[in-house]
Each structure stands twice: as C-alpha cells, then as structure tokens.
C-alpha cells in the first residue's frame, strides 16, 4: 500500500462531473423521493378521491384521478421516484386497475421502513421481513377469495362499475358497466381475452348516456368517392394491406415520347391495369373494400361504377380488427385475393357521428371485435371516460381469467393487517419487526379512503378492525355513508389479482429502494433545477450530495 493511502488520502476514481451519495444519506434521499410520489396520488384514491389538473409545457391540460396517468404526465426525474412510477405501470399492464393502491402501498412501506432504519434495523432484515409478509398476505387473500363464473353477469357488471367509481362515469355507471361486460364477452375466444379487440371511439357531443356498443368495427374514414354507395347490405368485404394504384418501377427510367399517340398509349395502359385491379375485386364478389394504402382516382371511378364502397389509408390496426370481426383475411397483395379471403357483414355504411363521418361495419355474426362509442359534453369528459372504461375492461378481463374476486372498501387490507400481526409472532429475529411494519403499512388504504371521504380515519379504522375481529372478512368502508358494511352484499368487489399484484409490485419496489446504499451519478442529475439559493425545490427536491430533485415534481409533494 502506498504512503499516500496509508495517510488516509482517498483515491479519486470518479470524474469531476460525477456525484455520489452513500450510506444513510442515499437511503433517506431515495425513501423521500418514493414517498413523495405516493403522496402525489394519495388524495385521488376511492370513490370520493379528488382529481388532478396536469398542464404540460405546451399548455395541454389533462384532468384525471387515474394514478398511472397522473404519474406518466408528471415530469419525474429522480431515479428512485421512477421506480415507484414503474409500479403503477406494471399494475396497469397486468390487471388494468389498482395503480393508485399499488403506489400508495409502496410509499407507506418505505415510510415504515424508514422508522425501522432509524431504530438500527438493517435494510436486508427489513427486505426479508417484507417478502415474508407479502407471501403470507397473498396466501390469505387466495384463501378468502370469492369464486366468480362467466355466467354470473350480475357480479361482472358490479366489478366493472367498481372500477369506474370516482372516475367521472358515476352518472351512467349502470349503462357503461353493462356495455363493458358485453364488450369483453364478445371478444372472448378459446385463446383468452384480448381487450385490444375492443376499440374505443370518443365523440364530443351528447351525454354519457348516449354511449353505445357496436358489435363490429368503426373506421374513422369516409368513402373515397361520393358516387359510391352510402351503405351496402349483406356485404362481402375485401381487406387489402396494399394500394390500388399502378406500381412504380424500382429503377428510375427515362422514356422519350415523340408522338402524342405514344403518350396516350401509356395512359391507356395505366387505365387498363387499374380496371383489371377493380375487375379482380368484382370477380371475387367484393361489395366493399378497405385498403391500407392509396386508391388511384381512376380506380375510384371504376369502383364507384361497380357499386363497391371503398375506404383508403385505413390503419393497420383497423384492418386487423375488420378481419377478426368479419371472418375475413388481410391480403397483402391484390394478386393473391380469393373469395375465401372476404369477410362478411350485414351492413357497411357511412354515418355521421358527432359531426364526423365514419364507416360502420355492423351486424356481424359472432363478432370478435367490437367498438365502444363514448360520448360526453367536453373533450376532458370523454378523455377521462375513456380511462375509466379501459380500467373497467381490464378488471372484467382479469376476473374472467382468474375467476376470483375480493370485497372492496379497504376490507382486504384490514383483514391482512390483523392476520399479519398474528403471523409476526411466529417469525423469528428482527424480521418480526418488518412483518409488523408491513401490517401497519397496509392500514394506509382504509385510512386514506376515510380521509378522502371527509371521515375520521381513526374512528373508521377502529370500526373496521372490530368487525374483522368478529370474523367479517367482507366488512369495508362505505365512503358515501361513512358506515362499515358488507361489501360483498353491496356488490363492491374487485379482482383478486388487483390486490395480489399491488402487494407484490409495491413490496418489490420498496425492497429494491431499501437495498440501495450508494447512488453514483455520471453527470448532473439536478432534474432541471437552477441550483440557486432561492429555489427551495419542495419536498422531494434535495437528493443529498448535490443530486437533484424530481424535476416537475419539485414542490408537488406538499401541494397534492
């Protein structure tokens, strides 16, 4: 060892722009950032949760209480905070709902862990205890789940309605939940349920009550020629991922025309090719054609002459939905088309929807692709309605896949909190403290539901625990009346996987953050802050060691 090292002189291995925060400072910094994210969405939880107005740099406004939308729209730079954002995204991808619950759980687990760290409990010990508690929690939920079948339509509609609660769809919740269940059951097949086959068309104008389900596909296009029929009944449909145009040569060539007759010959030949294309469609019996690319003007003329309704530049996703709905096949080249490739619909026609012309492909037998038309008075209303419907579609799909649900209203969390406290007694070592902290953290959900409903959280928790001590697993908090009621009887239920995924994701995120004891930044992670003495940066600002805050979240932790 060199003399310099023996004298305690540190060896500099990082660049001068690099920043490093280690030990308790790093843990505290990351925990603070994670808690700030959870705090930002906490007031949106439950049927009486508040909305957030998010304004981006371009002045675009989003009004929502959907957890994952809020976090996606916020300008979050802090790496630990982004881990919590990923929790909400995972929850959304896996089950479609419960994003706010997952994030709040993660934030509270970090808060409880901070107290244990202050009491000299090692982060690894906390991580082990949290994982044991999470496994036990999932086991308890599995044991108490309620079985649901595809035939239990009443329960399915209640699940759909629960997912919409507090998301701007209250006035038409009964109608919308019926539409959602109809849509999911319509696209269900032997391979499972792909909610991407439920297309959502937003229409500004009318009321939410005017929303409807079309068993078929709506294409946001018009006929290419006004001389084409406005509607076709009992239509054979060609779906072409190609152009009805004369193909250009791949090699640039120059042709010298010395005689006007030669030019006319070129034009005649081009017209002949286009007519042959249309003749191919007529020959296979097509009454309507949807094309993914362009349609030449001359081809449009011949199509109209043959009474074929044509649509050009349809989106690839629309072509796939058309094929699924009508039983047709997307053909990549017109030369390959055969009669067996055509789909069938009882009606193909152009209709006015909210002032815009769209093509409706309806009356499809056993349609495996459907369209929900959502109406509302303003753009903000239909946007939030779309988010509510997407959540609802996700939970109905998850319920049909798993066949198990749980009561809502904070009932599962209250039961888990009690059972995990008992379980902690059987856990040896300091992990017992972590299991108890996990149980304490789960109380955040019923407590937040009570706070957001303007109720006393302590009184509500006491009532809930008392009922659960008496063996009432389904006892949950009614945010409208403030009473503790049987949520299963009330029809407030949600998929089992929403809760298990929320616990799993929150636990993994919290454990990952707790195990970080060193943050090394290769450059300036100031998060866009100026670094001036006057800039407070808000709750999640300082990252210790000169590291930055959470960008657009500076000061938002306390504001929300």
From Swiss-Prot:
InterPro entries cross-referenced by the UniProt entry: Chaperone_TCP-1, Chaperonin_TCP-1_CS, Cpn60/GroEL/TCP-1, GroEL-like_apical_dom_sf, GROEL-like_equatorial_sf, TCP-1-like_intermed_sf, TCP-1_chaperonin, thermosome_alpha
GO MF term set: ATP binding; ATP hydrolysis activity; ATP-dependent protein folding chaperone; unfolded protein binding
Skewed-composition ranges (Gly residues): 538-550
Residue ranges, annotated region (Disordered): 525-550
Function: Molecular chaperone that assists in the folding or refolding of nascent or denatured proteins along with ATP hydrolysis. ATPase activity is highest in thermosome assemblies containing CCT1:CCT2, followed by assemblies containing CCT1:CCT2:CCT3. Required for thermosome ATPase activity. Not required for growth.
Note: Can substitute for loss of cct2 or cct3. One of either cct1 or cct2 is required for growth.
Subunit annotation: The thermosome or CCT complex is a oligomeric complex of two octameric double-ring structures; the complex is probably a heterooligomer of CCT1, CCT2 and CCT3 with yet unknown stoichiometry.
Full protein name: Thermosome subunit 1
Organism: Haloferax volcanii (strain ATCC 29605 / DSM 3757 / JCM 8879 / NBRC 14742 / NCIMB 2012 / VKM B-1768 / DS2) (Halobacterium volcanii)
């Amino acid at each position: 060892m060199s003399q310099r090292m023996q004298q305690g002189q540190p060896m500099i291995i990082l660049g001068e722009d690099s920043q490093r925060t280690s030990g308790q400072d790093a843990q505290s910094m990351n925990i603070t950032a994670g808690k700030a994210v959870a705090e930002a969405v906490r007031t949106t939880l439950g049927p009486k949760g508040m909305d957030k107005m998010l304004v981006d740099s371009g002045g675009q406004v989003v009004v929502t209480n959907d957890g994952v939308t809020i976090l996606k729209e916020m300008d979050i730079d802090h790496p630990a905070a982004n881990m919590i954002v990923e929790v909400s995204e995972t929850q959304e991808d896996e089950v479609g709902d419960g994003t706010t619950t997952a994030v709040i759980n993660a934030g509270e687990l970090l808060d409880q862990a901070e107290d244990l760290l202050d009491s000299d409990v090692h982060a690894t010990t906390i991580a082990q205890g949290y994982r044991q508690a999470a496994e036990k929690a999932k086991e308890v939920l599995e044991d108490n789940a309620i079985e649901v079948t595809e035939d239990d339509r009443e329960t399915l509609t209640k699940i759909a309605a629960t997912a919409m609660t507090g998301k701007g769809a209250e006035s038409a919740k009964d109608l919308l939940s019926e539409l959602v269940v109809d849509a999911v059951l319509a696209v269900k097949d032997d391979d499972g349920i792909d909610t991407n086959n439920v297309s959502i068309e937003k229409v500004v104008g009318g009321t939410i009550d005017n929303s409807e389900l079309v068993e078929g596909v709506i294409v946001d296009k018009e006929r290419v020629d006004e001389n084409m029929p406005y509607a076709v009944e009992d239509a054979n449909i060609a779906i072409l991922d190609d152009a009805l145009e004369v193909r250009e040569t791949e090699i640039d060539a120059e042709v010298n025309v010395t005689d006007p007759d030669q030019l006319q010959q070129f034009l005649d030949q081009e017209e002949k090719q286009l007519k042959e294309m249309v003749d191919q469609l007529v020959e296979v019996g097509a009454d309507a054609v949807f094309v993914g690319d362009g349609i030449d003007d001359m081809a449009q003329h011949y199509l109209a002459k043959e009474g074929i309704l044509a649509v050009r530049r349809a989106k690839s996703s629309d072509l796939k939905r058309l094929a699924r709905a009508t039983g047709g096949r997307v053909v990549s080249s017109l030369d390959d088309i055969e009669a067996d490739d055509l789909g069938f619909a009882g009606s193909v026609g152009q209709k006015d929807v909210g002032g815009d012309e769209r093509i409706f492909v309806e009356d499809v037998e056993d349609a495996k692709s459907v369209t929900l038309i959502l109406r509302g008075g303003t753009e903000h209303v239909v946007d939030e309605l779309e988010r509510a419907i997407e959540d609802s579609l996700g939970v109905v799909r998850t319920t049909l896949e798993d066949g198990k649900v749980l009561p809502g209203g904070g009932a599962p969390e209250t039961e888990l909190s009690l059972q995990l406290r008992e379980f902690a007694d059987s856990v040896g070592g300091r992990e017992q403290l972590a299991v108890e902290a996990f149980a304490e953290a789960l109380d955040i959900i019923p407590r937040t539901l009570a706070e957001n409903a303007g109720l006393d959280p302590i009184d509500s928790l006491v009532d809930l625990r008392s009922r659960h001590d008496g063996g009432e697993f389904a006892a949950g908090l009614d945010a409208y009346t403030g009473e503790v009621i049987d949520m299963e009887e009330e029809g407030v239920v949600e998929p089992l996987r929403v809760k298990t995924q929320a616990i799993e994701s929150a636990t993994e995120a919290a454990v990952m953050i707790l195990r970080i004891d060193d943050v090394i930044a290769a450059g300036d992670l100031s998060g866009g802050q100026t670094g001036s003495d006057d800039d407070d940066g808000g709750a999640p600002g300082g990252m210790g060691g000169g590291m930055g805050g959470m960008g657009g979240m500076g000061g938002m932790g306390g504001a929300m």
